[in-house]
From Swiss-Prot:
Protein name: Chorismate synthase
Top-level taxonomic group: Bacteria
Signal sequence, renumbered to the chain: none
SUPFAM superfamilies per the UniProt record, alphabetical: Chorismate synthase, AroC (SSF103263)
Gene Ontology biological process: amino acid biosynthetic process; aromatic amino acid family biosynthetic process; chorismate biosynthetic process
Biological role: This reaction introduces a second double bond into the aromatic ring system.
Residues holding NADP(+): 40, 46
Cofactor: FMNH2
Residue sites binding FMN per the record: 136-138, 257-258, 301, 316-320, 342
Nuclease keyword on record: no
Lineage of origin: Bacteria, Bacillati, Actinomycetota, Actinomycetes, Mycobacteriales
Alphabetically ordered keywords of this record: Amino-acid biosynthesis, Aromatic amino acid biosynthesis, FAD, Flavoprotein, FMN, Lyase, NADP
Recorded name of the encoding gene: aroC
Organism: Mycolicibacterium vanbaalenii (strain DSM 7251 / JCM 13017 / BCRC 16820 / KCTC 9966 / NRRL B-24157 / PYR-1) (Mycobacterium vanbaalenii)
Cofactor binding: number and manner: Reduced FMN (FMNH(2)).
Amino acid sequence: MLRWTTAGESHGRALVAMVEGMVAGVHVTTQDISAQLARRRLGYGRGARMKFEQDQVTMLTGLRHGVTLGGPIAIEIGNTEWPKWETVMAPDPVDPAVLADSAARNAPLTRPRPGHADYAGMLKYGFDDARPVLERASARETAARVAAGTVARAFLQQALGVEIVSHVISIGASKPYDGPPPQAADLTAIDASPVRAFDAASEALMIDEIEAAKRDGDTLGGVVEVVAHGLPVGLGSFTSGDNRLDSQLAGAVMGIQAIKGVEIGDGFETARRRGSVAHDEIYPGADGVMRSTNRAGGLEGGMTNGLPVRVRAAMKPISTVPRALATVDMATGEEAVAIHQRSDVCAVPAAAVVVETMVALVLARAVLEKFGGDSLAETRANIDSYLRAVATREPSTDGARASG
């Protein structure tokens, strides 16, 4: 079973990603991970931190000469600001006199931000300061997820030729993009867009939204879409809820900071249609069955159906609002304004890259559960055997459609 976890705090020495259960023989390098982390820093409306956040990657274990060994993989992402925080965030006790020299950074944060983990985290864990909460709850943690996901992406591409691409559907109240989903070849152009939009008209509307929010001292959320091309029929299962691939994808994506909604395929729009126009009709074709639509987003009954998997995620506006929202000072019980940590106006373009990451990890796990293997070569052999078996069971005809 493929497993992953992360460790570390936003202003700690480093973040660490752990990946366990990856087969041997997958080619992945420090440069590959750095390239994906650079994509995570993209986006119009990002804050000052992106200017000096360098994401210093160190491969600690699990690889030799750029190839996975089959054991646990550990990846460290160093914090370039650590010297400024070394005293305040030190793991070991610090002399109070020394700590006093960092009084500004060490001041208790007692005014929780609405929409953030501050309030519930302070009460749940017994903290009188939000610092221990926000350090781990921060979206900075997603850098470690991207590192782990890079390994999963490499496996998917090398085992099956799977390509994963994302784009931003809308930001704030901008008109949502409603054209065809992007192909893998479109990724370079999407990354070149300041908001990672797939078309120029949508890009202009999104930038206008961000500029207006910036002028008003506000923040924005939005909707992103991830598309995975090249998956075979049959990943996941209908046998129980937790085996359904769409439930696994939804759970993983909802676990990303600030994500408040997930849909597969046309999702909520499907609920507004009649059944006669909500599903993807099946027709005979020369190379097997074919579809003229992909409203289900490549998943039916919890299993991939051979079409691209489409996952959308809704990101709420960042909860650190420059003009500060009303709150209560937890130390005094009095009305106050929320603390303001350095933040972005909009991080939706970066969130799309993180959603790619979680989709890649879940899909890689599903592939390994289905096909197994200790090495990439063994997994490929199992995949090839399965695909041949599926091909013999799939109907094929040169006849014309009877309907549609």
